[in-house]
Amino acid sequence: MKHLTPREIVAELDRHIVGQNAAKRAVAIALRNRWRRKQAPENLRGEITPKNILMIGPTGVGKTEVSRRLARLANAPFLKVEATKFTEVGYVGRDVEQIVRDLVEAAVGMIREQKRAGVDKAARDKAEERLLDALVGAEAQSSTREVFRRKLRAGELDDKEVDLDFADTNNPMQMLDLPGQGGSMSMINLGDMLGKAMGGRTRRVRTTVREAAKPLVTEEADKLVDEEQIVREAIMAVEEDGIVFLDEIDKIAARKDRGGADVSREGVQRDLLPLIEGTTVSTKRGAVKTDHILFIASGAFHVAKPSDLLPELQGRLPIRVELEPLTRDDLRRILVEPQASLIRQYEALMAAENVTLTFEDGAIDRIADMAEAVNKSIENIGARRLQTILERLLDDISFDAPDKGGETFTITASYVDEKVGSLAGNADLSKFIL
């Protein structure tokens, strides 16, 4: 993990997300506290637990994006899940421990990619030798191999077909799901058992040199890395640096004025308590402790209130951050300021067709005005409204772009009014189109 200060973390988040400084500060401090804990004396380290966060704010204001960018910044195992997908233990469906199992699998994939990158050169060399064996035979003279090696590296043989043996990873009995468990018993993996019992099976594939190159490098890299070490490091990464973003937490808050049992509400909250507090979860990779996993819960809380959550769950989410609804100025900044702003994305998409797309300042102002107006009059979906309006605005240009190579399109305020103005002004049409 990079040892960034909270100020540096906020500055990095500012490159991608507009506003929401309170949320950025909260996650920046939480991330820095991980590094601080690792510097603490050994006898204190186990006692310092992460201060989990509850983000409160309407949809489309940046709750998910803050967490996603934070995970990329920390290079940490990250999982985003909706709280509504889980049911109480004992009922048909996924139980909350599946969160940890999925997080471990995400970490294994992340660590494996890092290990593959470390042996990339050796894997490429071995893949090249296998391709040469397929092209000229393993018994060919070294001079012949060198001639073909030069041609291979120059790309002259890319379209030539070769027969290669690849490890057979397909298994019709890959996973045993027990009835009613919703895949949560994934530690019982028949594919692993049968694969070890039958040894490494291979299958012969006829393919071109170009198409074979990448899977060959991946296969050779997997032979060079230690799978057990990957699993050990993945479990450690989850236990020390894992981040879980628990969205729609407000949807499992049981409101006081509603009676009756509801398996997807209070029961799920009770199941979440030990997970967030710290417990040990069995996975097919081994036991995983959740004591130091950072949980970031979020919800709009339009109907329910944070106080409708179980008191014990509220206590396990001590940091409360309220995200502000987006203003017209925020919407305008979202269009132009982030490193991968929506305007830049659409310009890049059109550039692929050799079409130059430019937006006048007046057009950007009109788009922001319309987004704010529709959000206020119909349903506030935050920054996502900008995408809806831009798609509608650029519909004709996107459709005709392949036939307009070399041309330049300038989006003006009048063009925005012409394409979207009538829809934005008509509340009934906006409900269905914008």
Curated annotation (Swiss-Prot):
ATP binds at V18, G60, V61, G62, K63, T64, E65, D247, E312, R384. It comes from Hyphomonas neptunium (strain ATCC 15444). It comes from the Bacteria. InterPro entries: AAA+_ATPase, ATP-dep_Clp_protease_ClpX, ATPase_AAA_core, Clp_ATPase_C, HslU, P-loop_NTPase. ATPase subunit of a proteasome-like degradation complex; this subunit has chaperone activity. The binding of ATP and its subsequent hydrolysis by HslU are essential for unfolding of protein substrates subsequently hydrolyzed by HslV. HslU recognizes the N-terminal part of its protein substrates and unfolds these before they are guided to HslV for hydrolysis. A double ring-shaped homohexamer of HslV is capped on each side by a ring-shaped HslU homohexamer. The assembly of the HslU/HslV complex is dependent on binding of ATP. One of its GO terms (molecular function) is peptidase activity. Keywords: ATP-binding, Chaperone, Cytoplasm, Nucleotide-binding, Stress response. One of its GO terms (biological process) is protein unfolding. The lineage of its organism: Bacteria, Pseudomonadati, Pseudomonadota, Alphaproteobacteria, Hyphomonadales. One of its GO terms (cellular component) is HslUV protease complex. The gene is hslU. It is found in: Cytoplasm. This is ATP-dependent protease ATPase subunit HslU. Belongs to the ClpX chaperone family. HslU subfamily.
